[in-house]
């Protein structure tokens, strides 16, 4: 396996402006929609990481303690999900067959814990907000030839990226190469 590398930042023109083609996904074909989201997450991961970082920095500037608490709770919830999936076959099957439900459960547990701790609004704006915007963009953005080539290189293992490792941990490795 090659070393993990962050891909280059995609041009703003490619990401959201001029050449960016956006279209609503077909809700009747959820598998194709899932492939589009996963492939866009892999291709634009550096741009998404930057957007997430900016959102987190803004929330951290306004409410630093609640932002740190939000990040810690979500990280622990994701860690528990990955650990449970690695040690328990039933959880692994559930995670692979219902990835959206597992992600929603992690976010719901995070929101519940933070609601009890008083940081629910900060969680919604600092973590859930940017994640929602990233998923909306990944759903709407149509793939181009360059995107498809980069994803094939990732899927055959010639290049490893942080998003590829995250998708693998969430049980989406079989989807990522499609």
Swiss-Prot record:
Function noted in UniProt: May be involved in ER/Golgi transport and vesicular traffic. Plays a proapoptotic role in cerulenin-induced neuroblastoma apoptosis.
Any single Gene Ontology cellular-component annotation: glutamatergic synapse
Subunit structure: Interacts with CCR5 and GDE1.
Entry protein name: PRA1 family protein 2
Major subcellular location class: membrane
Membrane-spanning intervals of the chain: 42-62, 65-85, 97-119, 123-140
Annotated source species: Homo sapiens (Human)
Coiled coil: none
Keyword Heme: no
GO biological process, one term: L-glutamate transmembrane transport
Keyword Membrane applies: yes
Stretches of the chain found on the membrane's Extracellular side: 63-64, 120-122
Cytoplasmic topological domain residue ranges: 1-41, 86-96, 141-178
Tissue: Strong expression in the brain, small intestine, lung, spleen, and pancreas as well as in tumor tissues of the breast, colon, lung and ovary, with a weaker expression in normal tissues of the same patient. High expression in neuroblastic tumors. Strongly expressed in Purkinje cells and more moderately in cells of the molecular and the granular layers in the cerebellum. Detected in neuronal cells, but not in non-neuronal cells in the cerebral cortex, hippocampus, and lateral ventricles.
InterPro entries, alphabetized: Prenylated_rab_accept_PRA1 (IPR004895)
Domain of life: Eukaryota
Topology within the bilayer: Multi-pass membrane protein
PANTHER family recorded: PRA1 FAMILY PROTEIN 2, PRA1 PROTEIN
Protein location: Endosome membrane
Protein family according to the UniProt entry: Belongs to the PRA1 family.
Keywords tagged on the record: Endosome, Membrane, Protein transport, Transmembrane, Transmembrane helix, Transport
């Amino acid at each position: 396996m090659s070393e993990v590398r962050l891909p280059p930042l995609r041009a703003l023109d490619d990401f959201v402006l001029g050449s960016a083609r956006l279209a609503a996904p077909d809700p009747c074909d959820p598998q194709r929609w899932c492939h589009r989201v996963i492939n866009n997450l892999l291709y634009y991961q550096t741009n998404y990481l930057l957007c997430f970082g900016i959102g987190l920095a803004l929330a951290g500037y306004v409410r630093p303690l609640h932002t740190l608490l939000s990040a810690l709770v979500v990280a622990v919830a994701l860690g528990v999900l990955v650990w449970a999936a690695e040690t328990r076959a039933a959880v692994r099957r559930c995670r692979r067959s219902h990835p959206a439900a597992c992600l929603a459960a992690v976010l719901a547990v995070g929101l519940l814990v933070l609601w009890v701790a008083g940081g629910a609004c900060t969680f919604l704006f600092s973590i859930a907000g940017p994640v929602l915007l990233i998923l909306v963009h990944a759903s709407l953005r149509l793939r181009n030839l360059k995107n498809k080539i980069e994803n094939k290189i990732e899927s055959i293992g010639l290049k490893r990226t942080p998003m590829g490792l995250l998708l693998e941990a969430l049980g989406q490795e079989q989807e990522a190469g499609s």
